[in-house]
């Protein structure tokens, strides 16, 4: 029994020490383990251990924000709640309370702080028993305070204090450094530094609108919704973003000061974040719609995003709000210059007395010079000069002009480079919405929008889309009814379409001569129409005028090289005239454009056979449309390789996945290249063939010509295999 009483007495003794450490009377000031703590200092001294305790002794971690206030001679009941790992200041009121508490503690240098008093030593046995009975207590090498709060109530009882816990007390071993909440202990906490951010301005923080960043989100106005896709913005140097950056962005986008919102927008614009800058400028305009600067800045953001038309409209609004706003005039001049409106750009550039940007002035002069040369060359029909000058004007700065792109397409069309004209037409800049104030600006003596429809109508006509050509020509005529060029085009398009319709009707009635005359009537108005030339070539073919048909096909292909119909017609004509080399050349081009057309493949095969015969080559046992032939013996393989022509032998294993995949492609090659012999050998079924050919890896391809091996490929890709087959098969 005596052995059991000793630790109990020791435990009670330590408990008394613990209770004494919680006593707030003045007579406790002389305790050797009590240290005064300056709450304004980020440093808390470590506690010394009594010699009677082991190294596992633990200590409490407490707040220093004035949760327990000491008074000489009397200690009132105080309820204390420990802070979480990351304290969150909810309002300026709590901040002032913290500051006042810190001030009180610093005034009395002899009064021990609660944080120091809670750091008194105690018995490990009692600590472990108490910790095991409480929920949320943690032990270990690294300790983190529990999220649950605990309350400690201290009541005066002579020289002792009683401790009651409503929730779990944090029993922490000595020697482990634990964040104490609001008392920042150097080296013990690794919190991220909080940056200075701009406050929303709704309250007074004592230092203007600059506050410490925190995890609190500002109050959201009901008029706007949160957008998590927006790039966060922060005033700090912390590039990692985080809650402070997000808070700064929210403060900016939901702020009530338009100048601050504009300033944030300018910062985003300088960083190249034009979409985010645009949203901030929109917010500034919402707060102050009559500010010309905000509209001008919004125009700059829109211009950087490629929305030229809307940027022009914003500049016009800014100028209406402030007619003497030089920046808006210069910005509008630059935008109009990009659209090719040189005269209007010059008006705005020289409308203010501000110093002009020499770069913009030089750009304006260059574009104006090239456009003047382009206009004169177009009137004379010198389309090569037109193409050169309009390209130079675009390169000089008018890079967003739909009309200049249309002029380039028109020049290529007149130079019979229809394929190039199509590519240019696909890349015409789109200006939406089109500035209404410049809708009647003229290009080449034509209203800008009418000129766009004018060129489109010519392109539709050249591509054989006659109905679309009529519609676009009619649209141009309605926009600019006084223009002579537009009226002539509209008239010619209707006549050409009528001639095409009449020729098609006669062709269906097999009245080929009359149909040919109808097509010729349409060619009077458009001599370079590839569609009408092809139709007339077909009529020549039907009546046996093969040479005339070839001439029309040549002319059509010169204008539009990608036109399939005249090439197919010409290949058939070459076959009729037994011009096998030209026929094979045309059919090979058609095979590339239409690889799965069996009629073209068969025509190519027969043309190749005829070409070989014309050269004196032996062409025995050559059949079109054969399948891949399976070889079952070595003698069968030798017999197959003695055939004239090229043979492709595929060595494979049926169970191999790669062989299965490539076998499907070999079947397709057999259809694409019917003049070649395709053979396959399963090396598991025919091991003697594989051994004789020394096949060790599958799939393996060997190409033979007249029994002589030309090439061997092991595990090729589909592209490499087809390239090799095409090389040796043609």
From Swiss-Prot:
Reported phenotype of the disruption mutant: Decreased efficiency of the male gametophyte transmission and reduced fertility.
Inducing stimuli: Not induced by salt treatment.
Top-rank taxon, per record: Eukaryota
One of the protein's GO biological processes: response to stress
Function: Plays a role in the transmission of male gametophyte.
Record region (Disordered): 23-168
Species per Swiss-Prot/TrEMBL record: Arabidopsis thaliana
Record flagged with keyword Cytoplasm: no
Protein's UniProt name: TPR repeat-containing thioredoxin TTL2
Upper classification of the organism: Eukaryota, Viridiplantae, Streptophyta, Embryophyta, Tracheophyta
């Amino acid at each position: 029994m005596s052995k059991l009483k000793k630790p109990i007495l020791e435990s009670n003794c330590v408990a008394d020490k613990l209770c004494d450490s919680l006593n707030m009377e003045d007579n406790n000031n002389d305790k050797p383990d009590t240290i005064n703590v300056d709450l304004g200092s980020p440093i808390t001294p470590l506690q010394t251990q009594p010699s009677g305790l082991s190294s596992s002794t633990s200590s409490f971690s407490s707040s220093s924000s004035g949760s327990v206030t000491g008074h000489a001679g009397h200690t009132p009941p105080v309820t204390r709640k420990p802070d979480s790992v990351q304290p969150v200041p909810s309002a300026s009121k709590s901040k002032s309370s913290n500051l006042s508490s810190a001030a009180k503690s610093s005034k009395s240098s002899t009064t021990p702080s609660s944080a120091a008093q809670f750091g008194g030593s105690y018995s490990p046995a009692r600590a472990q028993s108490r910790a095991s009975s409480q929920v949320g207590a943690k032990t270990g090498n690294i300790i983190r305070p529990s999220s649950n709060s605990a309350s400690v109530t201290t009541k005066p009882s002579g020289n002792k204090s009683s401790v009651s816990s409503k929730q779990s007390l944090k029993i922490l071993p000595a020697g482990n450094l634990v964040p104490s909440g609001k008392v920042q202990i150097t080296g013990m906490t690794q919190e991220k530094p909080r940056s200075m951010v701009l406050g929303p301005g709704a309250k007074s923080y004592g230092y203007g609108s600059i506050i410490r960043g925190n995890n609190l989100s500002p109050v959201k106005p009901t008029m706007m919704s949160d957008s998590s896709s927006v790039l966060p913005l922060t005033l700090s140097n912390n590039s990692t973003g985080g809650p402070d950056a997000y808070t700064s962005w929210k403060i900016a986008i939901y702020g009530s000061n338009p100048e601050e919102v504009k300033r944030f927008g300018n910062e985003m614009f300088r960083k190249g974040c034009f979409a985010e800058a645009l949203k901030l400028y929109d917010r500034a305009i919402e707060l102050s719609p009559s500010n010309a600067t905000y509209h001008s800045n919004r125009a700059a953001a829109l211009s950087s995003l490629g929305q030229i038309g809307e940027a022009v409209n914003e500049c016009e609004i800014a100028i209406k709000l402030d007619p003497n706003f030089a920046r808006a005039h210069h910005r509008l001049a630059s935008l109009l210059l990009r659209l090719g409106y040189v005269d209007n750009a010059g008006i705005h550039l020289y409308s203010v007395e501000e110093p002009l940007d020499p770069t913009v002035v030089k750009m304006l002069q260059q574009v104006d010079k090239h456009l003047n040369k382009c206009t004169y060359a177009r009137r004379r029909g010198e389309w090569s000069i037109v193409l050169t000058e309009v390209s130079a004007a675009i390169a000089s700065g008018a890079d967003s002009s739909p009309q200049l792109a249309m002029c380039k397409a028109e020049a290529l069309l007149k130079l019979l480079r229809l394929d190039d004209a199509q590519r240019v037409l696909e890349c015409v800049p789109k200006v939406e919405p089109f500035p209404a104030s410049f809708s009647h600006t003229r290009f080449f003596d034509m209203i800008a929008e009418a000129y766009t429809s004018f060129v489109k109508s010519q392109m539709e006509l050249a591509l054989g889309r006659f109905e679309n050509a009529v519609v676009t020509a009619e649209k141009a005529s309605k926009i600019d009814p006084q223009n002579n060029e537009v009226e002539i085009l509209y008239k010619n398009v209707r006549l050409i379409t009528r001639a095409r319709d009449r020729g098609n009707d006669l062709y269906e009635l097999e009245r080929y001569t009359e149909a040919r005359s109808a097509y010729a009537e349409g060619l009077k108005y458009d001599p370079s129409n590839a569609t009408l030339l092809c139709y007339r070539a077909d009529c020549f073919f039907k009546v046996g005028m093969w040479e005339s048909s070839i001439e029309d096909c040549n002319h059509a292909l010169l204008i539009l090289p990608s036109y399939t119909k005249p090439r197919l017609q010409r290949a058939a004509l070459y076959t009729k005239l037994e011009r096998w080399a030209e026929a094979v050349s045309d059919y090979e081009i058609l095979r590339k454009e239409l690889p799965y057309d069996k009629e073209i493949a068969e025509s190519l095969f027969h043309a190749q056979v005829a070409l070989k015969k014309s050269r004196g080559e032996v062409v025995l046992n050559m059949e079109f449309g054969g399948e891949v032939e399976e070889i079952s013996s070595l003698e069968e393989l030798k017999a197959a390789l003695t055939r004239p022509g090229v043979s492709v032998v595929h060595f494979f294993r049926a169970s191999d996945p790669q062989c299965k995949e490539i076998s499907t492609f070999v079947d397709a090659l057999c259809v694409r290249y019917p003049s070649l012999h395709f053979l396959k050998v399963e090396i598991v079924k025919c091991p003697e063939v594989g051994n004789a050919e020394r096949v060790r890896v599958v799939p393996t391809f060997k190409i033979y010509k007249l029994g002589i091996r030309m090439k061997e490929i092991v595990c090729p890709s589909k592209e490499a295999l087809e390239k090799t087959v095409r090389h040796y098969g043609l």
